[in-house]
Structures are given as structure tokens and as C-alpha cells.
Amino acid sequence: MGALAHTPEGMFLQDIGYTQDISDGVSRGWLQITDELRPPGSSQVRASVLATMSDVWTGTLAGMACAPKLALTLDLTARIVGDVGGDRLDIVGRLLKQGRTTIVAETDFRHPVTGAVVALSHATFVASPRPQDVVGPLSAGRTSGNALNRPIAEALGAQVLSPGVVLIERGPYVNQPSGTLQGGVVAVLAEVAAETLTGARVVELEVRYLSAVRVGPACTSAVTIDDHTVRVEVRDAGNHDRLATVVMARMDR
């Protein structure tokens, strides 16, 4: 997953309501939460949506630090620590480390009235070693409106084949400009796999990106580790079942 110079026309991020502004090296803004961003039967926002927003918030900062090289996301976490059941969250992202080889970032999700931190995310980025992976100037501000009219997993095309087995086809709505599956889509895919396997809500995700889904479809397999933990693998089924992502999901049960 890489930082975007802008949100491509027709991509799912344009259908999520948020505003982002970067100044003095800090990425600030807010996320509008609608029912489409919640799991079925829950008042809480999806952990994978928080992971996606974290990648947008700090991926832009990492991209600016790596420019003109593309910043690639190596790993991404989202941990819900409070009530995320309102209709808005304020978001603050910053870089914790900017080294020669890696960049580490943190994102806080805060209650819009009290300012209390209700979710946390951390991400590690690296500049792409491929000379062709370059980006233009990154925007210091973005705004998009709520346009989802069905649950986000359904909108992204997630198909549940059996408990823990979910697939998503590549396509313009879910792809990066490079044609690979966008990393937030992979996080949603893994979250749905863990949900369908256990019947419980995900409250924490640890996502390790190993390779891009270049052919598709992306397909999951999931196993329970203990009463609260599910391990999910995401593979590129059209590319010799290449392992693309490993996810650890913590369940609320």
C-alpha cells in the first residue's frame, strides 16, 4: 500500500466522509461515521475503517518524507480502546520516527467533544526500492463526502464463501492507481473473514503487508488462535496463491 498523491476518481475513499489538513508536520481532520462504516448489528465503527483512515493520515506524511519515491506501508495496526459509536471522530496523525530506511507513524482517534483518545493506530513505512515507483506532489488537504449507500464491505465487493473465507476482485473502485488492491480494502477483507469465522466484532487489527495483490481475486483463510484471536491470511489467488498479507484480529468476546 502506498501514499496517494490524490484520491483517484471513482475510488472508494471518495465515498467516505472525511476532511484532512496537514500543517507543521501534523495531519489533522475528522471522519464522519455512518451506519455503512459499522459492522452488521453494531453501533461501533469498523477497525478496518480506522486502519484505512490512519494510512491516509500518516501515509501522506510518510509520502512527503519519501518524495519523490513512493512510501509503502509495511505494517498497520488499529486498536479500539473506547467508545467509537458516535457519528464523528477527530483524527490526529504524526510521524514518530523518520529514518533513512523506515518511517514510523502514530494516529489518534479522539472523541469530538471530550478529546479523549478512543482508538490508536501505528504504521511503518518504507520508501519503495523500485525506480519506477514515484509520485507527484502530495496534497496537504483532502475532503470527501458520504456517498456509501450500502455497508462498506458489500460496496467493496466482499463475497463470503464460507466462514473465514472471503474474496474481493480487483477493479477501479478498490485499486491503487498502480492497479494493485488498495491496502484498506485488504484490511476490510481480513476483518470480515474474522467476523464470519467467530460471529464476534473485531476490536484490534495487526496488518502485515508482504506483497501486493496484482492479479486477484484476493482470498482469505482464517483460523482461531484462542478465544479472542484470529489469524487471517490474504492471498492473491490469480498469482499462484501468493501470500500477500497476514493479519491478527482481536475479537470482542
Model-found features: residue ranges?
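Intrinsic-disorder/low-complexity, polar/charged segments enriched in Ser/Thr/Lys/Arg/Asp/Glu/Gln
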Residues: 26-28, 75, 88-90, 104, ...
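Non-catalytic linker/capping segments at the edges of enzyme domains
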Residues: 1-30, 34-36, 124-172, 253
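Short solvent-exposed loop/turn micro-motifs enriched in small/polar/acidic residues
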Residues: 11-15, 100-102, 151-153, 200, ...
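Hydrophobic beta-strand-centered segment that forms part of the acyl-chain substrate-binding groove
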Residues: 58-90, 95, 188-220, 224-225
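Hot-dog-fold acyl-thioester-processing enzymes
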Residues: 12-14, 28-59, 164-196
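Residue-level recognition of conserved beta-strand positions in structured domain cores
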Residues: 31, 168, 209, 232-234
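HotDog/MaoC-like acyl-thioester-processing domains
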Residues: 71, 82-148, 212-215, 224-253
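Alpha-helical transmembrane segments of multi-pass membrane proteins, especially transporters
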Residues: 47-48, 74, 232
